Amino acid sequence: ERRDESGRTGSAGTVGMAIGAADVAGAPSASRLIPPLATTAIVLVAAKLLAHVAANVWTPYEFHRDAFLYMAMGTHLRILHMDFPPLMALISEAVRGIAGASLFAYRMIPAVAGTAVLLLAVLIARALGGGKRAQVLTALAVLVNPLFLRSANLFQPVVLDQLWWLLGCYALARLDDSGDAKWWLLLGVAGGVGLLAKFSILFFGLAVLVALLLTRHRREFLGPWPWLAIGIALVLGSPSVIGQVTLGFPVVEQMASLSERQLARVGFGEFVTDQILWQPVGFLLAVLGATTLLVHPALRRHRLLGWVAIASFGIFVLLRGKSYYYGPMHPLLFAAGAVALERITRRRLRAALTWGAAAGIVAWGVLAIPFGLPVVPPEPMARFSSAIGITSAVRTNWGEYLPLPQDYADMTGWREQAEAVARVYRSLPPAEQAEAVLYGRNYGEAGALDFYGRELGLPPVVSLAGSFYLFGPGERSGRVIIFLGVEPQEISAITCQSLELADRVTNPWGVPEERDVPIVVCREPDMTLQEFWNQVGHGYWG
């Protein structure tokens, strides 16, 4: 006999997985002892943070349209009266107050959160009994995956959603391994803070519930700990719940609109294909991980996690969820797959599969890095996207195809729009400037005007789109309204004494609605903005 790299013994001639007798019997064993944290894995965690710092310094792109919305929500912060979970707005105001409103400062938040995602993936591999090889392979699979690279560059709740899902998985892994009830408390914290970030944490909660009912853990409901975890989650996430109650559950309208305009186009084939394309070798590792969690005797105490992964996959398929919704489960499955490879007892086979998986993961990751880190300028990025030929990488939520990935297209042209509006505003007589109000057709345009307007000296910004409707019409009556993104013939809800097409802003790299954007000046409308607000109502995706 000999001892392998992870500290287990096995016969050199044995084919398959190294499973100790104590593991099969469920008795305490060496595998229950948490292996040491691999130094190389920690180096990879640090490398991820450094990569995002570098990308944030040298990026040729602006803020994403969604970031403008969350920054505006922070400016109009009303924690218990918000249509979206308030955590991003709170973070936005904290960043603005501590570090200033710079692109680098805001993007360091997802960079740190994304680094924490990678660290949690390593810790999960360790909790599953993974030694150095398993931890490093898990770290590689997450590090170069374009899904996790991109989410860690965008000031959005996506990376926070990934973080809290994974923290919940880590709590379940430790609960399975130790039986210590305190891990229920961490699960509750993950659910509660996750509810402050994104409502999709509810799908994780549903998947956990299904998994608990399908495993031996169903008996836990006879005790206090699961209920205490639920209570903690509800208390911590209560601002999100209270906001929905006070506003009449706008999330229902949001989801209905999202389903009609975007999710209806998501089919099973597309959903699965995207899981593969993010990391083809990683996908095989994830499939191995799911299988290992469900059927491998040595990991049978972690079967709960396997059912969480299966249940969440089924939920998103049934609800036609976007492909990235399942992203938080990938690190868990990478970890389980890496542990499975590490447990192969034939040394040469184990080495060949592990090194082969690592090489395949890194090779695809290097090729896909431009789709994860926004460092390549638009024109060469468009050429690269065309040369690669992966159409799903440049497909929008509406099924259209762009020269750039949609997230990249949504990071172009905003400052040009604000500067064009500023020129139109400054061309007005002083009396009209004193009365002027800016109107953005969608939350990206309104948010960009609101953000850059402070620097450019622009008047207040209003919009009926998304959360901006809740911010209200402001105090000015709107005797002069400068519309951004609205054609003159589309202004029908009010009648203007004069209507002037003052300018147009073109952006060949933007999404279709931002490529040729009109700027229209409306003078002496037949109603005040306050009357207009009460009459028209809002639209979340307008």
Describe the residue ranges of each PLM region.
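Transmembrane-helix signature of polytopic, membrane-embedded enzymes
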Residues: 2, 20, 39-42, 121-144, ...
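Membrane-interface transmembrane helices that cradle and orient dolichyl/undecaprenyl
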Residues: 126-128, 168-184, 289-297
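Short helix- or helix-capping micro-motifs
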Residues: 45-47, 138-143, 191, 195, ...
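Membrane-interface alpha helices of multi-pass inner-membrane proteins
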Residues: 76, 139, 183-198, 232-235, ...
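Short hydrophobic alpha-helices at membrane interfaces in multi-pass membrane enzymes
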Residues: 174-192, 223, 227, 307
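Transmembrane-lumen/periplasm boundary regions of multi-pass, lipid-linked membrane glycan transferases
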Residues: 202-302, 316, 370-374, 385-388, ...
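Transmembrane-helix motifs of polytopic, lipid-linked glycan transferases
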Residues: 108-129, 167
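Short acidic/glycine- and proline-prone juxtamembrane loop motifs at membrane-interface regions
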Residues: 147, 153-160
